[in-house]
Amino acid sequence: MSSKKRKSPPQESLTSYFEKSSKSSKKYGSQNKDSDSSSTCLQQKIEIQWSITDSLYIAKYGKLKKTKKFIAFDLDGTLIKTKSGRVFSKDAADWTWWHPSVVPKLKALYQDNYSLVIFSNQNGIPRKPSAGHTFQMKIRAIFESLDLPIVLYAAILKDKFRKPLTGMWNSFLKDVNRSIDLSFIKYVGDAAGRPGDHNSTDLKFAENIGIKFETPEQFFLGHSFVPPNFESFHPKNYLVRNSSSHPYHFKKSEHQEIVVLVGFPSSGKSTLAESQIVTQGYERVNQDILKTKSKCIKAAIEALKKEKSVVIDNTNPTIESRKMWIDIAQEFEIPIRCIHLQSSEELARHNNVFRYIHHNQKQLPEIAFNSFKSRFQMPTVEEGFTNVEEVPFKCLKDYEDTWNYWYE
């Protein structure tokens, strides 16, 4: 995704906007009792410095201390919440501090020589033309209410900047422009994989960076937190568990045959087909390329008539979707085998984002995974296959150093 900087609005327009915002900041921020003038650390008016690209908003308020100690936060559900009780704020004024202890805690951190940073996913901004301006107004009110040097990074697209990916963190490191000791850094966020949490993005973000993590309840209120164990899928643990397993090697049949691949989108079917099966003379039939089922059938039959073996590189989730290939094999009186790629849904979704970020491949929509999951029927020899091979996913060695991060 392009991150080319858009032309910034004229300074006069920004100044006019900030003046208007400052007049209304009392309406937005001063009703929060934590922001009384006696605790203000910045006595003069500070203009927010905005840097806006196609997928990243950066807002700087004041100048961060030259310190090795940083505390980073999520925004929504961690530092602030909506006044209305809605999940998403209805306007720039629909916010209040998450808890009365937030501002005193942040001011104490500042006095203790900590620099404050916010990393936030804001993917709602591109959906509405006015959302970007509304977000800037809200940030203006929040920063003026807090009145401490602070910097915000907000990812607005599903690209390298979106948590749990570390693009925002890398941008921050570039801006800080000095070495940072990760042992002095902590990230606080509400998306921690607990029952009731919308996801575990914040916890995974901290794990990707390699820094300590706390929930807002833990950090501000002193509550305990037991991290989830991610038993179903954890990229680093998956690599460790499968480090000693041997990679799958496709064995070419001595006779003409049909091979039917079965598995989630992004489970490795096409990689297997292209790297191991097509290279041994098999004709690949793929509906993403041919577009329709009828064209797939036609291509397979034409290859079989030329006495070539065929590999069906589709998801093939149901007995019915596989039956037509079994019928064709019986018509040609040749064997048909099935290779089931045993990637879990979590692993497949992980691969989907991984190949989008690192290999510039199109990211598949949510419905592709939900559809396969809801329709999937385990392949068996009773359907008519001569055998069914179960093949676990094996990450290519060259990709392990980047694949082992959280992407979802």
Swiss-Prot record:
Molecular function as annotated in GO: ATP binding; ATP-dependent polydeoxyribonucleotide 5'-hydroxyl-kinase activity; polynucleotide 3'-phosphatase activity
- Localization per record: Nucleus
Q: Which reaction does it catalyse?
A: a 3'end (2'-deoxyribonucleotide 3'-phosphate)-DNA + H2O = a 3'-end 2'-deoxyribonucleotide-DNA + phosphate; a 5'-end dephospho-2'-deoxyribonucleoside-DNA + ATP = a 5'-end 5'-phospho-2'-deoxyribonucleoside-DNA + ADP + H(+)
Q: Name one GO biological process term.
A: DNA repair
Q: Which residues does the annotated region (Disordered) include?
A: 1-38
Instruction: Indicate the principal place this protein occupies in or around the cell.
Output: nucleus
- Phosphoserine modification, residue list: 8
Report the Gene3D superfamilies cross-referenced here. HAD superfamily/HAD-like, P-loop containing nucleotide triphosphate hydrolases
Q: Which UniProt keywords apply?
A: ATP-binding, DNA damage, DNA repair, Hydrolase, Kinase, Multifunctional enzyme, Nucleotide-binding, Nucleus, Phosphoprotein, Transferase
Instruction: Quote the record's binding site residues for ATP.
Output: 263-270
Composition-biased stretches (Polar residues): 10-19, 28-38
Keyword DNA damage listed:
yes
Cellular component, GO annotation = nucleolus; nucleus
Family of the protein in this entry: In the N-terminal section; belongs to the DNA 3' phosphatase family.
Q: Which PANTHER family match?
A: BIFUNCTIONAL POLYNUCLEOTIDE PHOSPHATASE/KINASE (PTHR12083), BIFUNCTIONAL POLYNUCLEOTIDE PHOSPHATASE_KINASE (PTHR12083:SF9)
Q: What does this protein do?
A: Catalyzes the phosphorylation of DNA at 5'-hydroxyl termini and can dephosphorylate its 3'-phosphate termini. Has a role in the repair of breaks in single-stranded DNA.
Protein name as catalogued: Bifunctional polynucleotide phosphatase/kinase
